[in-house]
Amino acid sequence: MKQSFYRYLMTQRDPNNYEPVAQFANNAFFDQSFPKHEGDYELLSQYLELNGSYLPSMLIFDEAYQLYQESEQA
């Protein structure tokens, strides 16, 4: 069964890691409205563009989503 993007992203959390994807994961954890059961790129991207003030660049989301897709193919 395919896991949601959020579930994958939570595997990247690390409060001591200052890499952009880890920081994105740390901040998304505290976002009560994050679409936790979603895996669709367009819907996630739209949500983050409107609500992801903690995300300094959408390129970070793109990188995290690419890693998510790779993990789903493994």
Curated annotation (Swiss-Prot):
It holds the Pfam family YozE_SAM_like. SUPFAM superfamilies: YozE-like (SSF140652). InterPro entries: UPF0346, YozE_SAM-like, YozE_SAM-like_sf. It comes from the Bacteria. NCBIfam families: PRK13672.1. Belongs to the UPF0346 family. This is UPF0346 protein LCA_0996.
